[in-house]
Regions:
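Short coil/linker segments at helix-helix boundaries
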Residues: 21-25, 33-46, 60-234
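Residue-level detector of the short coil/turn that links helix A to helix B
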Residues: 37, 123, 222-223, 262, ...
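Solenoid-like repeat scaffolds
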Residues: 20, 47-54, 98-99, 145, ...
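Alpha-helical repeat scaffolds
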Residues: 45-47, 79-96, 127-140, 171, ...
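Alpha-helical segment of the N-proximal tetratricopeptide repeat
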Residues: 25-39, 371-388
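Alpha-helical adaptor scaffolds
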Residues: 211-215, 219-220, 259-260, 371-384, ...
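Residue-level recognition of tetratricopeptide repeat
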Residues: 31, 65, 72, 110, ...
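Generic helix N-cap/helix-start motif at coil->alpha-helix transitions
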Residues: 20-26, 101, 149-150, 168, ...
Length: 496
């Protein structure tokens, strides 16, 4: 879920025992309940805390977290309205006392930041920018007052990293808000926070959170999948993560990293082992992830998690994409009538906020049945089954220009991730030469991948050429995501 990594990082700002921000045993348990999406239990504990310790500010922060998570995970209008209605009241409560605590300004920044991200989710972009700007200012001021405060580093690290991904044509908006930041700067700040937490037994309960932040930046912004995978493997060795299966957000985080690393079997095992519980707020996106992972392995039961997601999720994002995957499933399993039904449903439900859903709608509107060899190769590649993906393309022949373009692109991607870079490069270049004037994403993503190959080889001139080429292309599919990654690449190699 491309938006979730950006949204969920806001969850992982924890609390400690300080003045009016007392993270006592009751609040720690409420926080754990919240992390595990046991919202009712967490809310009940916070009601009790307000009666026992009326000066403690922690309940207002945890209550806002709960409302925020409902908005992000459930995407329902009523929850969004509830979050907005309570924003000013909670800010007033947090500003009453505790001025000498680093949590005083930080907690207010979190309220604004969560409000801003929720507004983005519901397309209120102007108000979102105002909220995020206010959060940024509060974090900067708090850093001036408390330069060693660990969660300042985490919060600003994420914001600085995200600022560094803004494409050059939108940098004017960043400058107008006087935002500053780069991916290396943000990554460094989050690493500092992680090391500080890892070395202090008193902060050990923050370890999963800071690792989540670090893996988020490493995976999504620094584009270093092996490093992100290595971090997760290290975290899995820690006894602190025996509760992983109890925390859906951690399950999501690890599954996302395994997926990007081509460890699809691990994705399926992790998500299959997770058990939904009636005492937890339902995170239906995990069903979607499981269905996609199973389809990437061409499993015969891949349809069931996708149907579960579509039958229960009341939000709008990834609905069209789920229908597209179901259509592909029935095409692969030779049920043409079911295939047609789900192609039509793509047009009827969902929205176009995320790249995946826009691709699904375009797919349905074109009404062109995909070539089975290309489709299987795409899915198997997404699952990391590179030999099977290559075999699916053996014997592929076509006179269709777009299908041929996808064929060269798929071969480039397969060889690239199969660690056969020199075989991938000519296929990427052929895709760029044949498709840079077409609206499809194949040429742009080929240029992005070449930029990453040359960056890792320390050939920064070539890397800069290909990253810049992405930003010069005019294409429709996955435009926001691919352009952001290209801009992030340029920022990483700036001055090299």
């Amino acid at each position: 879920m491309k938006l979730i990594p950006i949204f969920l990082f806001l969850l992982f700002f924890s609390l400690s025992a300080q003045a009016s921000f007392s993270f006592n045993t009751n609040c720690k348990q409420a926080y754990t309940d919240m992390m595990c999406l046991r919202f009712e239990q967490a809310a009940a504990r916070m009601q009790s805390e307000k009666k026992l310790n009326p000066d403690n500010q922690v309940p207002f922060i945890i209550e806002n977290y709960i409302d925020f998570l409902k908005v992000i995970l459930g995407e329902e209008d009523r929850d969004f309205i509830h979050l907005k209605d309570n924003k000013d009241l909670r800010l007033q409560k947090l500003a009453l006392h505790g001025e000498n605590s680093p949590w005083f300004l930080y907690s207010q920044a979190l309220i604004y930041l969560q409000s801003g991200v929720a507004r983005i989710k519901f397309s209120e972009y102007v108000n979102a920018s105002l909220d995020i700007n206010r959060a940024y200012r509060l974090l900067i001021e708090n850093r001036r007052k408390y330069p060693d405060f660990v969660m300042n580093k985490a919060g600003l690290g994420i914001l600085h990293s995200l600022i560094g991904t803004v494409p050059s044509k939108y940098r004017w908006a960043v400058r107008s808000l006087r935002f500053e930041g780069t991916i290396p700067e943000g990554n460094s700040e989050i690493k500092e926070a992680y090391l500080q937490v890892a070395s202090d037994p008193q902060l050990s309960f923050l370890l999963p959170e800071t690792v989540f932040l670090l893996t988020f930046v490493t995976l999504n912004l620094s584009a270093d999948v092996p490093e992100a995978l290595n971090l997760v493997e290290k975290l899995n060795e820690a006894s602190i993560l025996q509760i992983t299966n109890e925390c859906p957000l951690l399950v999501y985080s690890f599954a996302n990293i395994y997926s990007r690393a081509g460890e699809n079997d691990k994705v399926i095992k992790l998500l299959s082992d997770y058990k939904f519980s009636p005492d937890k707020y339902p995170f239906y996106y995990l069903n979607y992830m499981l269905g996609v992972a199973k389809l990437n392995r061409l499993d015969a039961d891949a349809c069931y998690p996708l149907l579960n997601f579509l039958g229960n999720f009341k939000g709008k994002n990834y609905i069209r994409t789920a229908y597209m995957h179901l259509a592909w499933y029935y095409l692969i399993y030779n049920e043409p009538e079911q295939y047609k039904i789900y192609v039509e449903r793509i047009k009827l439900r969902g929205n176009d906020q995320v790249d995946n859903d826009r691709e699904a709608l375009t797919f349905a509107q074109k009404n062109i049945t995909p070539d089975l060899s290309l489709l299987k190769a795409r899915l198997l590649f997404d699952g990391g089954y590179y030999a099977r993906a290559k075999n699916a393309l053996d014997g592929f022949r076509t006179a269709d220009k777009v299908a041929r373009l996808e064929y060269t692109y798929r071969l480039g991607r397969i060889y690239d991730n199969w660690d056969k870079k020199d075989l991938a490069i000519p296929y990427y270049n052929e895709t760029i030469n044949e498709g840079d004037k077409l609206p499809y994403y194949f040429a742009a993503n080929s240029a992005l991948q070449l930029g990453m190959i040359y960056e890792k080889r320390n050939d920064f001139m070539q890397a800069r050429t290909y990253y810049s080429k992405v930003l010069d292309m005019d294409f429709d599919e996955y435009q926001f995501s691919i352009s952001n990654k290209a801009q992030a690449g340029l920022n990483r190699i700036k001055g090299k």
